[in-house]
Amino acid sequence: MDLKDCKIYLVTDEKACNGKDFYSCIEEAIKGGVGIVQLREKNISTKDFYEKALKVKEICKNYEVLFIINDRLDIAQAVKADGVHLGQSDMPIEKAREILKDKFLIGATARNVEEAKKVELLGADYIGSGAIFGTSTKDNAKKLEMEELKKIVTSVKIPVFAIGGININNVSLLKNIGLQGICSVSGILSEKDCKKAVELMLKNFN
């Protein structure tokens, strides 16, 4: 799948599944219309991350959706993911691009216009901006005002995805402002029916 065709971007968090099978949740979300899956793991060993990444990659490959690894270039390369997402405190984008060449997508986090312009200049393929509605999955995430998000969208030419507390009830507030799409964690994974949640998100966003 091409980045420009993706509207719903799933960022994983096994805890958000609330006891449901992690891999089944991902597969159901993809069936509902998720176009990108980012595997985000902060507190597991490299070996466990690698093994988890292989399983998620297989699911993504079966459904022809993009597979992104959060932060870890080594894991992304080892499992031949489609790309890597880098936050402001991760490896510099220009260094990642030097290592990965043009074979991998590089996503970047930007919370204001200055950061957005900078990451675009450094070679990012897309931007994730938030937390637009606050979030329970990231402890240090500051809320991003809607006006600032709109400015970010108009300041760059690369696709922008909003993230942070987005669910089926508030996603409609983000349509028609120029976003490529939206990223969601618990707004998909914590729902009883992940497939239906994504279908509703798509319907309410379009």
Please annotate each region the language model reported.
Residues 76, 133-139:
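A short acidic, helix-capping loop that chelates divalent metal ions and anchors anionic groups
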Residues 74, 147, 183:
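Active-site phosphate/pyrophosphate-handling residues
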